[in-house]
Amino acid sequence: MVVNGETIKFRAYEGIVYVKNSIDAEYEVMNIYVPEQYYQNGNIDGFTAEMAPIFFPNQIGGYMPAKPARPELKRPRGPMAENAVQSPNAAEVALSKGYVVASAGARGRTAANGKAPAAIVDLKAAVRYLKANDKVMPGDAEKIISNGTSAGGALSSLLGASGNHPDYEAHLKALGAANASDDIFAVSAYCPIIDLEHADMAYEWQFNGVNDYKKMSVTMLDYNVKRELVPGTLTEAQKALSDKLKPMYPAYINSLNLKDAQGRTLTLDQNGNGSFKDFVTGFLAQSAQQQLDAGNEVKADWLTVKNGKVTAVDLAQYAQTAGRQKTPPAFDGVDLSTGENQLFGNADTDKQHFTAFAMNNSTVAGATMASAQDIKMMNPLNYVGDANAKMPQNWRIRVGTNDRDTSLAVSAVLAVKLQNHGAKVDYALPWGVPHSGDYDLDELFAWMKQLSTQ
């Protein structure tokens, strides 16, 4: 393959079943790619066969089943990518820079055997396979760097936060996963759809009062396929749900006892204002300022700019301009209509609730609630700071300023909670970028290189 004018030779080992007791042989497989130079005792950019980090990208979108990635020409991942030029995907770029690439497929919500926590268990099993076989294959399994977008970004985050945690052990044993650890070296996550049990509140904290929406067609949740926006206006019943959800978020934020870099506690008052809101808007200001400093024009009716400096961000106006994409509740639908409802189903029931709020307001007769343990095992925030989890030191999180798939607050909480527990977090909101991933591969691999050679 040719990357940036350079021909890349590599060996491909595809369709490797990474568990002994495979439940879904179509998805519980891994593709491994190794630069050819490593078989000739060569080195690439300072890496050798023994010490090359392992790049571990997943292709999961919408918590759907996903096959492993292959090195190929592709468009960036996301809804705005149909018109983008095809270029080498992350796996291909990784090979050109000397990384061993291992990409695992995983089960997903549309199958009875792919409900929570199947996808994260599969990714952990794949990591264990790499660790167990470290001595007999190129690449350093103590330097696994995961990467994913949207639900894949959530699972990349969860893989990092929950390393070696005993919660998953019974599931891994049942699959016949290798007897090895599953902690990883670093996490890259684009627009992670996490903290699902609080994401409905977060969405209304940001979008309450924005009553027109453009909703993504539910059949198009997998970000590898074309998505369709359907316009509409909230009903009175939906507005009432939004009004109930918004004031629930401050109590949750205040319960986390988050602190900024100066040690100040991040809080919200009963109206949703406060230091946490300022913390979130600070990242929007930072993104705009970078554009201004680079000499680019910044047009946004929610920004105040004086003498080339951003002086204020109006989050309510930002929400109006960005536009609502989901109807309340955004994730746990009272009619059990969301992809996340299907994620939290089980072998007997395709769709279930996973918040008390939606359960109490359910419009579906006989609706049931997912188990507390399954809900816990899908949220990285539940494992950050848990002494039973081995968490990586290094994290890179990116969410575009045009992303409306979840509240900006969600990724901000992840970033600051990680920092509060000693992690180094590179967190930013790239200007004008929608819900998408792998759009800044030069920067991603520069970050990975710096970590890997420390």
Predicted ranges, named:
Residues 114-136, 446:
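Alpha/beta-hydrolase active-site loop
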Residues 30, 44-63, 67-74, 145:
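Short beta-strand element of the alpha/beta-hydrolase
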Residues 54, 92-107, 145:
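A fold-wide structural signal in alpha/beta-hydrolase
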Residues 199-205, 239-306, 396-403, 410-415, ...:
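C-terminal catalytic histidine-bearing segment of alpha/beta-hydrolase fold enzymes
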Residues 71-101, 173-174:
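Short amphipathic alpha-helix adjacent to the substrate-entry channel of hydrolases
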Residues 132-210, 375-376:
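Primarily recognizes the serine-hydrolase "nucleophile elbow" in alpha/beta-hydrolase
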